UniProtKB/Swiss-Prot annotation:
Species the sequence originates in: Archaeoglobus fulgidus (strain ATCC 49558 / DSM 4304 / JCM 9628 / NBRC 100126 / VC-16)
Signal peptide segment: 1-16
Domain of life of the organism encoding this protein: Archaea
Protein name as catalogued: Uncharacterized protein AF_1565
Keyword terms of this UniProt record: Signal
Length: 69
């Protein structure tokens, strides 16, 4: 079973996202898979917005700091 995943630092219109430098990642992932993405974050906090095709399916997002914690 393949499920769609959209990962974005903020939810906004695509044109507006480009204007303010929001990075979006579109990908597909299957049950049991892990996908890794890296991005340099200049502030102490950032927002993540996940869109999952089927809300009844669970999704875990883990964010690691540069030291691995």
């Amino acid at each position: 079973m393949s499920l769609g995943l959209i990962f974005a630092l903020l939810l906004t219109h695509a044109a507006a996202a480009k204007e303010i430098g929001i990075k979006t990642v579109n990908d597909y992932i299957k049950q049991g898979e892990s996908h890794w993405y890296t991005s340099y974050v200049t502030s102490h906090t950032f927002d993540v917005y996940l869109v999952w095709n089927n809300p009844s399916n669970s999704l875990t997002l883990t964010v690691y700091s540069p030291d691995g914690s």
